[in-house]
Amino acid sequence: MTNKIITYILKPLGFLAILTFVLIQLNRVLSFKYDDGICQMEQFYKQEENSIDVLVLGSSHAFVNINPQILYEQGGIQAYNLCASMQPTWHTYYYLKEALEYQHPKLIVMDVFRLVENADYSKETALIKSTYGMKLSSNKWESIRAGLSRERQSEAYIYLFEFPAYHGRYEDLTREDFVFDKEKMENYKGFYPVSKVAPMKRPELENITECTPISQKTWDYFQQILELAKTEEIPVLLVNVPYIQSEADKKIFNTLEEHLQNYDASYQITYIDFNQKYDELGIDFDTDYADYDHLNESGVDKLNYYLAEFIKEHYDFGS
């Protein structure tokens, strides 16, 4: 009788264990494996608590162009790129909120390129890349909701639990879905190297002085980032890394420079527009770009040698 009871209990438990294992493996295979957003956040959680000196925020302009390895080699700076492709400022804000649950960096470096965003809601790919790596939390929930229009708020749960959004990927599976190595992002500290070379024409924008307004929602969340950093007493180094800047973008960043004058010293904000420092960096437009938006390894080296020296000179991380 006792054996029958044990068998009666163990059979369903065994079935549940097998089912759980199968679902976990299925989830692993079907899940999105973007290494330009999701992996950066997933590997961030594996960093030792309070081990990050410099938290890098932004879009691909940040995670392709800022190399934590060079910052460490040149200045002993422990940096991590917590970024995602095409990331609007509302998702960046919630990335920062989430990061502060686990780390208290001594400096935030934020690339400002996405201030050119004029849409009020996230594109599907940007929403996924900016939220799917996050643990289940209020920050993830609010980030998803911020990225959806009022008419789509009822869909937020799909992105919160993730699986419903990618359960139909069976026909799209490739070999990479079974062997994808997410751990490399932990080793690269969120950096995404690009090695190709694409000759570019140097932008000539020195005479562009007009200003174009920054989208209200984009600016509101950017301000929240600065306010949160101030509350946490973390200085902010805003950067505009080298890319082939358009006249329209230049007018947006002229507006940014005007707005930043309204922030007093208590915010500890510094802004460097590297698009005005091509010669100082030694940028070669024939050899240092991968495409219109990103430097290649040669250009990245030049940018990060400068950045490491600047951080060492202007910020004291102590011990």
Q: What residue ranges belong to the model's regions?
A:
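Histidine-centered active-site loop/cap adjacent to the catalytic His
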Residues: 288-319
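Hydrophobic membrane-insertion alpha-helices, especially the h-region
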Residues: 7-28
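Loop/turn elements at helix/coil->beta-strand transitions in domains of secreted/extracellular proteins
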Residues: 51-53, 77-78, 104-107, 231-237, ...
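Secreted/periplasmic serine-hydrolase-like ester/acetyl group-modifying domain
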Residues: 125-232
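Extended hydrophobic/aromatic segments used for targeting, binding, or gating
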Residues: 217, 223-224, 230-232, 237-293
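Alpha-helical transmembrane signal-anchor/signal-peptide segments
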Residues: 29-50
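Extracytoplasmic/secreted proteins, especially bacterial periplasmic and envelope-associated proteins
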Residues: 66, 91-94, 136-139, 143, ...
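Membrane-embedded segments
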Residues: 57, 61-145
